[in-house]
Amino acid sequence: MAAYTKIKKDEDMVVVDKSTGGNGKYVFDPYNSLNKEISEEEIRELLAKYNVNVPIHHLVLYKRAFVHRSYTKRPAAWNEQNNITLVAKPEDCHELYTKSNERLEFLGDGVLECIAKFYLYKRFPKADEGFMTDTKIELVKNETIGRIAMEIGLHKWFMLSKHTEMKNLRCNHKK
């Protein structure tokens, strides 16, 4: 019988060593049955709820905004080089994605920071830059954004690997 040992090959995934003699073969199971992809109708309802009246172009970008890098395909060559075998996708799970939200997050972080700075500049006309910087940091930090995402229900559509789900990253805020 093979000995199973959890090891860490990458920050976003856990693989299981299935070797008996240290031959370094690994099994990777990222599939998460809790994932639910957001639909166009759900996007429309969410935007309408907050009075955001914009047409939905490029639905794929809205959907990609919810894809964590842990639920993306790794290059086959990387898997082969590291002796990693991807388990078969269970029927109740979504396919792994080819792209994550990271590049969109990079843009979004910049837009959010710009909006926060503009708001604070207008809202506190006599405040010094130290106060505005500290307040901006509090507004745009992950814990704040995670709490707001939970409050408005965005967490329902995050696409995360099973391991990332176990680390409770669907709720990326401190309580």
Where are these regions (language model features)?
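RNase III-family endoribonuclease catalytic core
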Residues: A2-K175
